[in-house]
Structures are given as C-alpha cells and as structure tokens.
Amino acid sequence: MVFEVIPAVDMRGGKCVQLVQGVPGSEIVSIDDPVEVALDWVRKGAKTLHLVDLDGAIEGERKNAPIIEKIVSACQKKGVQIQVGGGIRSFEDAASLLELGVSRVILGTAALKNPELVQQLSSTFGNEHVTVALDAKNGKISIKGWTEECAQTPVEMGRKFEELGAGSLLFTNIDTEGLMQGVNPVPTKNLVESVSIPVIASGGVSSLQDLRTLKKTGASGVVVGSALYTGRFTLEAAIETTQQE
C-alpha cells in the first residue's frame, strides 16, 4: 500500500487559507485563487486533494461549492481523486458532491449527530466513497468546527462507524493541528490498530520526519496543509520521503 501525501486546500470566503487550530481570523496563509492552488499541487505530484469548505464547517453554509465544482472538474481530467469536507450536513449535500465526481465525502458533525447518514450513503454509493472525520482534543471527540467536545474516544467512534459502513476514517489530532510543532503518533496508531478500514492522519505535520513517523503508525496517508504552504518542505520531497521505506 502506497502511503499518500494529500495536500489540503482549505477555503474560506472564496480564498485558500490555512488557520491555526481551526480558529477563524488566525490565517497564516491566504491565497486568492484556490483552483490554481489545487492545480499547482497536481502539477507537483498530488494524486489526491483534500478540499475543505471552512465556511461550511464553521457556519454550516457551503459558500465555496462553486469553487469546489471547478476544482473537481479540472482534476477529473487528470485522474486525481478529490475528497471534500466541511458543511456536509445531509444526504443531499453528500449526494450532490458524489454525483459531481468527488471521490470521497467527509462527514464530521453530521455523522456524529446522525449516524444513519453514514449507513444511507454507504449503501447508496458504496463505502469507498464515505469517510468519517474523527477530530480529537485531549483524547475526546470534538465536533462543530472543533467548538464542542464529546465524551467518546476516537477508538470507540472509529469502530462504530466502521460497523455502520464508513470506508475510511480521517483522524485529526486538534492538539497539534496548525501549530507545526510536530506530531504525536500514539492516538493515530491506537485508532489504526482498532479498525480494519484505512485511517488518514492529519494535524501538526511540520517536517519530513513527521511523515515518516505517521507512516509507521500504519495510516494509509496524511493530509498536509500549513507545512506545505509555509515552505517547511516541498510536496515533491514529501512524496519521495514516504516512498523510500
């Protein structure tokens, strides 16, 4: 299995941004044309892109849908997979993205509030198109754009959603997200070892060594944002590093 390095294209107000720990107004990067950003990652070797509508995640309104449509259309011609999250609150939201040609829809708050949604989408479109996002803070699940904490642990929820038909999990460690201070591999490893579906890691990657560390957890890939946008390493170097071992 090839460990995938997946560049993040986070959108807020029509721009490509990177926030610190998901806090609005904490932009460390703001670029005017997200479509061009996405195509640039593809030119540099990305096989999958991670698109997030932050307006959707934080306010529940998918304001960046037209931009996502443009990116999907441009990338489909190049055989690049697209996973999309942020503000997918209903079956209709997810279905419209999958019918557009998105490879995987990422359900966060919606899956936790309405687990049947995972089942419905999985049985309609196939589980390979359904990813559940598990965001953890202090070892507990966090929802609503990281503003609310739940009692459950990632392992408990990961097992539950695997049973319900999720084809993969996206695990974000909020404790390290956007800080670029390195990763803590333990929570990711625990989750990987508790389920039999792929786990994509996210949060805190700041060096090529972090990528090697996450690869060793057994994760199927990693979403990288701030480190790529601030030049900690290039995408080419990241892909080369993770394919060496």
UniProtKB/Swiss-Prot annotation:
Protein name: 1-(5-phosphoribosyl)-5-[(5-phosphoribosylamino)methylideneamino] imidazole-4-carboxamide isomerase
The reaction(s) this protein catalyses: 1-(5-phospho-beta-D-ribosyl)-5-[(5-phospho-beta-D-ribosylamino)methylideneamino]imidazole-4-carboxamide = 5-[(5-phospho-1-deoxy-D-ribulos-1-ylimino)methylamino]-1-(5-phospho-beta-D-ribosyl)imidazole-4-carboxamide
Disulfide bonding pattern of the chain: none
Localization per Swiss-Prot or TrEMBL: Cytoplasm
Gene3D superfamilies: Aldolase class I
Gene name of the record: hisA
Gene Ontology molecular function, alphabetical: 1-(5-phosphoribosyl)-5-[(5-phosphoribosylamino)methylideneamino]imidazole-4-carboxamide isomerase activity
GO terms under biological process: L-histidine biosynthetic process; L-tryptophan biosynthetic process
Organism this protein belongs to: Methanosarcina barkeri (strain Fusaro / DSM 804)
Main location, first listed in the record: cytoplasm
EC number: 5.3.1.16
GO cellular component, one term: cytoplasm
NCBIfam families linked to this entry: 1-(5-phosphoribosyl)-5-[(5-phosphoribosylamino)methylideneamino]imidazole-4-carboxamide isomerase (TIGR00007), PRK13585.1 (NF010112)
Pfam families in the cross-refs: His_biosynth
Lineage top rank: taxon: Archaea
UniProt xrefs under CDD domains: HisA (cd04732)
InterPro entries referenced in this protein's UniProt entry, alphabetically: Aldolase_TIM, His_biosynth, HisA_bact_arch, Isoase_HisA-like, Isoase_HisA-like_bact, RibuloseP-bd_barrel
Keyword list, A-Z: Amino-acid biosynthesis, Cytoplasm, Histidine biosynthesis, Isomerase
Residue numbers annotated as active site: D10 (proton acceptor), D135 (proton donor)
The family this protein is said to belong to: Belongs to the HisA/HisF family.
Pathway assignment: Amino-acid biosynthesis; L-histidine biosynthesis; L-histidine from 5-phospho-alpha-D-ribose 1-diphosphate: step 4/9
